[in-house]
Amino acid sequence: MITAENGPANEDLGPFQPLWDAWEESHREITEKPLSHFRRVLEIQFDEMEAHLASDNRKGAEYEVIDLISVALNLMRWLGNDPASIGELARSRAENRMRNRTAAILDKYQSRYGV
């Protein structure tokens, strides 16, 4: 992994690379958190997004979505991934799971979970 100590970060995460880089200083602490930490943080971020939407603050809601992406990236960090592996996983998942299958995915969530 490229860190501040051994060189500049790469750009494998495109526009999300700055989110990854911003959290690099807390890498060790993040990797030591229990999985339940991330679940709770996601719940908090969704609550905050809903509050922004309830007060017609779309920009605030958009920032909370960016925070959700940040949490997802830190989950990938927690799982031991670096930006290059995340980029490859995302490309692979999009191609092999999502492309031409999004309607079926939505149907699955509706039929199995009622959402």
Predicted regions mapped to residue ranges:
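Flexible "arm" and connector segments at domain edges
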Residues: 1-65, 69-115
